[in-house]
Swiss-Prot record:
GO terms for molecular function: DNA-binding transcription activator activity; DNA-binding transcription factor activity; protein homodimerization activity; sequence-specific DNA binding. Residues 325-345 have a biased composition (Basic and acidic residues). The lineage of its organism: Eukaryota, Viridiplantae, Streptophyta, Embryophyta, Tracheophyta. Transcription activator. Binds the promoter core sequence 5'-GGNCC-3', especially at sites IIa (5'-GGGCCCAC-3') and IIb (5'-GGTCCCAC-3') (essential for meristematic tissue-specificity expression) of the PCNA gene promoter. Can target the TCP motif 5'-TGGGCC/T-3'. This is Transcription factor PCF2. Residues 1-38, 149-182, 322-373 are annotated as: Disordered. It comes from Oryza sativa subsp. japonica (Rice). Residues 152-162 have a biased composition (Low complexity). Residues 28-38 have a biased composition (Gly residues).
Length: 373
């Protein structure tokens, strides 16, 4: 009996599943052939292994892709950048157009100047509404005076005086940084003495000449306003030959520690009126080594003569073919004597030699008609 009851229950479950599949088949076919239309998939609980699966929520698809909607357009006013107070500000387009028109009508150079003019015209209304005026951020108040560096020359009297004060303060600041540059027609501060910026220390060596000198801590002698006197002779301090540095044979000459400027004798023009001054240049002691240097020594005359005597003496013999004379020249004779001998040999061919003529006469035959017979 129990087995039959189980078989009937299984058959009932199979029939229920068949009916569910039959109902879901037409719905799937209609959704597939819709051609991109919105379709809702209705699914029922499908028993799996005697467990119930929750029914999924319907999902809408449009052409197989999810559509992203654009946000609505923003409704904002158009703004234009206008120059003002040294930076850019934003304002509605109608206000910007009006400012541009006022700039052309008033003949201003920039829109910022037009905005400044508008603020000046509306100053009473601004004070009545806020209790304060339109003071720029770059303006400063000194001793109850408002100073605006960028104020135009067409402003009121106090503002123009504030500009002048600002220019003077900037000029003073530049003169403090550069005290040596004095401009013609400037204030007395520009031509102030250097003592206002640098300490002046009088040199004790130059107190006799007035002491108007500035000490220079560079190791050099102080320079006076009159300059060096004329007619000075430089004398370099070099150790003598008998000093220990030279006598030792090391040839180590220490560098001069001072250079003294000594005036010329009293016979020079104007030398008696000028005081004697000494100019000293201090330097670190340095040594110069000449041991490795080679210097030319004195020439020994005796060795030179001995070398001349040891040289071989060449003999030149010149024979005169015409006169038969022989001239002997040693190596010590000069080339001029040799040239003279050659000239004499050549001239011998020009001079008549009676002996040669007589020999020629003897060789000639005597004719029959000659008177000698």
């Amino acid at each position: 009996m129990e087995a039959q009851a189980q078989d009937k229950a299984e058959e009932g479950e199979e029939e229920g599943t068949r009916q569910q599949h039959a109902q879901a088949g037409p719905v799937g076919a209609a959704g597939g052939g819709g051609g991109g239309g919105a379709a809702a998939v209705a699914m029922s609980a499908i028993p799996m292994n005697s467990w119930l699966v929750p029914k999924p929520e319907p999902v809408e698809f449009f052409g197989g892709m999810a559509m992203v909607r654009k946000p609505p357009p923003r409704n904002r006013d158009r703004h234009t950048k206008v120059e003002g107070r040294g930076r850019r500000i934003r304002m509605p387009a109608a206000c910007a157009a009006r400012i541009f028109q006022l700039t052309r009508e008033l003949g201003h150079k920039s829109d910022g100047e037009t905005i400044r003019w508008l603020l000046q015209q509306s100053e009473p209304a601004i004070i009545a509404a806020t209790g304060t005026g339109t003071v720029p951020a770059i303006a400063t108040t000194v001793d109850g005076v408002l100073r605006i560096p960028t104020q135009s020359s067409s402003s009121s009297g106090p503002a123009s005086s504030a500009v002048v004060d600002g220019e003077e303060s900037s000029a003073k600041r530049r003169r403090k940084l550069q005290p040596t540059r004095a401009v013609a027609g400037a204030s007395p501060l520009a031509t102030a003495a250097p003592a206002a910026y640098y300490p002046v220390i009088a040199d004790p060596l130059l107190q006799g000449s007035g002491g108007a000198a500035i000490s220079v801590p560079s190791g050099l002698a102080p320079i006076t306003a009159t300059g060096a006197p004329q007619g000075l002779v430089p004398v370099f301090a070099v150790p003598a030959t008998g000093s220990p540095a030279v006598a030792g044979g090391n040839r180590m000459i220490p560098q001069a520690t001072a250079v003294w400027m000594v005036p010329q004798p009293a016979g020079a023009a104007g030398a008696g009126n000028q005081p004697t001054q000494f100019w000293a240049i201090q330097s670190a002691p340095q040594l110069v080594n000449f041991a490795g240097a080679q210097f030319p020594t004195a020439i020994n005359v005796a060795d030179f003569q001995q070398q001349q005597q040891q040289q071989p003496v060449s003999t030149t013999i010149v024979q005169n073919s015409n006169s038969g004379e022989h001239m002997h020249f040693s190596g010590a004779d000069s080339h001029e004597q040799q040239r003279r001998g050659r000239k004499e040999g050549n001239s011998g061919g020009v001079v008549d030699h009676p002996e040669e003529d007589e020999d020629d006469d003897d060789d000639e035959p005597v004719s029959d008609s000659s008177p000698e017979e």
